[in-house]
């Protein structure tokens, strides 16, 4: 079982070939290929290689499946006795990707 730990959008993800996951929004369009070169670790056949902080020459390629927005969260500010109320919503944009290959 081969897996890698990649960094994108300020977060780290454990990925395997064929995985589909949601990452922070990427600029690539749907159907395009994205290459992640910030690979922190790779495990092949039980042997783990850890970078310092990244593994040189390692890369993970993925295909952009879709773009979208996450669930809505409500932000409500309130101050008592002053009739101050502010209600806003936020939906975080994401990109769904499918991992194609792990090299390195």
Curated annotation (Swiss-Prot):
This is Large ribosomal subunit protein bL21. Belongs to the bacterial ribosomal protein bL21 family. It comes from the Bacteria. GO terms for cellular component: cytoplasm; ribonucleoprotein complex; ribosome. Pfam families: Ribosomal_L21p. This protein binds to 23S rRNA in the presence of protein L20. NCBIfam families: L21 (TIGR00061). Keywords: Ribonucleoprotein, Ribosomal protein, RNA-binding, rRNA-binding. GO terms for biological process: translation. It comes from Symbiobacterium thermophilum (strain DSM 24528 / JCM 14929 / IAM 14863 / T). Part of the 50S ribosomal subunit. Contacts protein L20. GO terms for molecular function: rRNA binding; structural constituent of ribosome. The lineage of its organism: Bacteria, Bacillati, Bacillota, Clostridia, Eubacteriales. HAMAP family: Ribosomal_bL21.
